[in-house]
Amino acid sequence: MFKGLFICSLIAVICANALPQPEASADEDMDEREVRGIGKFLHSAGKFGKAFVGEIMKSKRDAEAVGPEAFADEDLDEREVRGIGKFLHSAKKFGKAFVGEIMNSKRDAEAVGPEAFADEDLDEREVRGIGKFLHSAKKFGKAFVGEIMNSKRDAEAVGPEAFADEDLDEREVRGIGKFLHSAKKFGKAFVGEIMNSKRDAEAVGPEAFADEDFDEREVRGIGKFLHSAKKFGKAFVGEIMNSKRDAEAVGPEAFADEDLDEREVRGIGKFLHSAKKFGKAFVGEIMNSKRDAEAVDDRRWVE
């Protein structure tokens, strides 16, 4: 359990410390303001990630938390709900800051491009916002994998002691790369569903967000996100923990060299779980923003 905690904490520390430097983004032609925005995002992500790990991993049921059965009926007990609630509260706060930093930027109309979301009927402003998020995620993923795979940079990025107990070999590095690559593809796929939906008003239910004053349309969008995230989470955890299903979902060659043990599975599962919850709050904040009046051209969004 403690090693699983170490893995999650390591990810949080890397999120907080590895990327904020302007020079890390030099090749991306980013201005100072954008670099500061990404730096603030990663710093906040590190803080709330640590808090979430602390709340969830202190419980006695960690070993079963990420098993396939944990996602079956979402039968979370009161203690788990309290931990998730605290996490979502933190996620909401840093989500607001992230939206402010990224959505107010002057650039990145080409980061994804309107044509990438043509079928979703998104206007240019929405595409820029989504593009910024995906672009940042892509850069973060590349840099994170780079830090792990290049031992010469470890001392500057995190410190050699952070990796001492883990002793990651090439096999483990490939596993981290696969996870980040899958997460990026998943994010791109479900963005369209969130932003251009006509259904799922019952997926979460208006009452779940009553205090946030979400209208029906916002609830539908959030419902789609949660539905997609739940399916993704089930499949990902199931594939990692059950080697018998690998051949159908990805192909045995994808995981053949990984040979993940139980400790690694718990760490990956916890990271995925926190990412899912952060995404839930982040999308909620984007869709409940005062700036959305222009983005979706709907008077119901105007105060």
UniProtKB/Swiss-Prot annotation:
Q: Which UniProt keywords apply?
A: Amphibian defense peptide, Antibiotic, Antimicrobial, Antiviral protein, Cleavage on pair of basic residues, Cytolysis, Fungicide, Hemolysis, Immunity, Innate immunity, Repeat, Secreted, Signal
Where is it expressed, tissue-wise? Synthesized in the stomach and stored in a novel granular multinucleated cell in the gastric mucosa. It is stored as active, processed peptides in large granules within the granular gland secretions of the skin.
> Which residues, in ranges, are excised as the propeptide?
19-26, 33-36, 62-72, 79-82, 108-118, 125-128, 154-164, 171-174, 200-210, 217-220, 246-256, 263-266, 292-303
Q: What is this protein called?
A: Magainins
Task: Identify one Gene Ontology CC term for this UniProt entry.
Answer: extraorganismal space
**What is the protein's major site of localization?**
secreted
**Gene from which the chain derives:** magainins
Q: Does the keyword DNA repair apply?
A: no
Q: Which cell locations does it reside in? A: Secreted
Protein family (similarity comment)? Belongs to the gastrin/cholecystokinin family. Magainin subfamily.
Q: For this UniProt entry, which residues form the secretion signal?
A: 1-18
Biological process (GO), any one = antimicrobial peptide biosynthetic process
Q: Does the keyword Cell inner membrane apply?
A: no
Q: What does this protein do?
A: Antimicrobial peptides that inhibit the growth of numerous species of bacteria and fungi and induce osmotic lysis of protozoa. Rapidly inactivates channel catfish herpesvirus (ED(50)=48 uM) over a wide temperature range. Magainins are membrane lytic agents.
